[in-house]
Structures are given as structure tokens and as C-alpha cells.
């Protein structure tokens, strides 16, 4: 019997100390680099977007890929890529950790729209509030005092 899976993830992570370093010039190049990592692991990218202080990636995880290793490869690889290509001069690193949330196939289109509209969304709500809302929505237990590294 063949193996078939449908594991739709939204992965979210921020810049170190949530510094607003991901300016618009350079984002498309960064997105293409991350897409290349996903593609090389046979994961299907549905949408990637960011604002100045954090990144959202919506993708289908291939059954042969471990999520933690994939996210580590994305964060380490993209950090080196950003620095080597001087995409964002003020960028120092990604924050430790990430959020990974699963969704049904039926939720995919709404999730893609949500990630596409990050600029408008963050005109009203900061990343901390968005992240806490995601954790609560997904019923993830967390300690709010330990969510983010502070300077």
C-alpha cells in the first residue's frame, strides 16, 4: 500500500527580540530561498509572508520530513542567507523557538488569505497579540511570561 498524507502546517517565528528588521526590499528573495528549502524536502509551499518582525509559512509537510529538523534548516539556512547577501542590514538572528499549527484541508484557503494579508492585519494588532491568539485558538498550553526572549 502507498503512503498518503495531508499535513498542513502554519509555522510562525520572529526575529530576535522581535526587532523590526525585515524591510520590504529583500523579502521576495528571502521567500524564494525558503521555498527552495521546502521544495528540496518535497514539502509543498502554499504561502509565505512576513512583516518587519516575524514570518508565516503555510505548507504541506512531506511524510518523510521531521518538522523540527525542517524548521531548524529554514531558520539556520535563511539566517546565513540573509547575512551573506546583506538582505536586511539590521537583522541579527531569528528568535529561539517557533509556533507550528496544523489545519484541515478545508481551512487552507482562509489560512492562505490570512497570511497574504499580514500587512493589513498588523496595522491593527502587534505580533505578540497575534501569537497569543494563535496559541489560544489552537488550544496550546503556554506560559505568557516565557513566550519571548527579551533584551
What are these regions (language model features)?
Residues 1-151:
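Basic nucleic-acid-binding interfaces
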Amino acid at each position: 500500500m502507498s503512503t498518503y498524507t495531508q499535513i498542513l502546517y502554519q509555522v510562525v517565528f520572529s526575529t530576535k527580540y522581535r526587532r523590526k528588521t525585515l524591510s520590504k526590499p529583500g523579502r521576495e528573495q528571502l521567500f524564494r530561498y525558503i521555498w527552495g528549502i521546502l521544495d528540496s524536502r518535497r514539502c509543498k509551499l502554499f504561502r509565505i509572508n512576513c512583516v518587519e518582525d516575524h514570518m508565516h509559512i503555510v505548507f504541506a509537510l512531506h511524510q518523510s520530513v521531521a518538522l523540527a529538523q525542517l524548521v531548524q534548516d529554514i531558520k539556520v539556512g535563511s539566517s546565513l542567507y540573509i547575512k551573506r547577501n546583506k538582505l536586511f542590514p539590521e537583522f541579527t538572528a531569528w528568535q529561539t523557538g517557533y509556533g507550528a499549527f496544523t489545519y484541515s484541508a478545508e481551512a487552507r484557503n482562509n489560512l492562505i488569505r490570512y497570511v497574504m494579508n499580514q500587512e493589513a492585519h498588523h496595522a491593527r494588532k502587534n505580533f505578540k497579540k497575534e501569537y497569543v491568539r494563535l496559541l489560544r485558538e489552537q488550544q496550546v498550553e503556554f506560559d505568557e511570561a516565557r513566550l519571548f526572549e527579551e533584551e
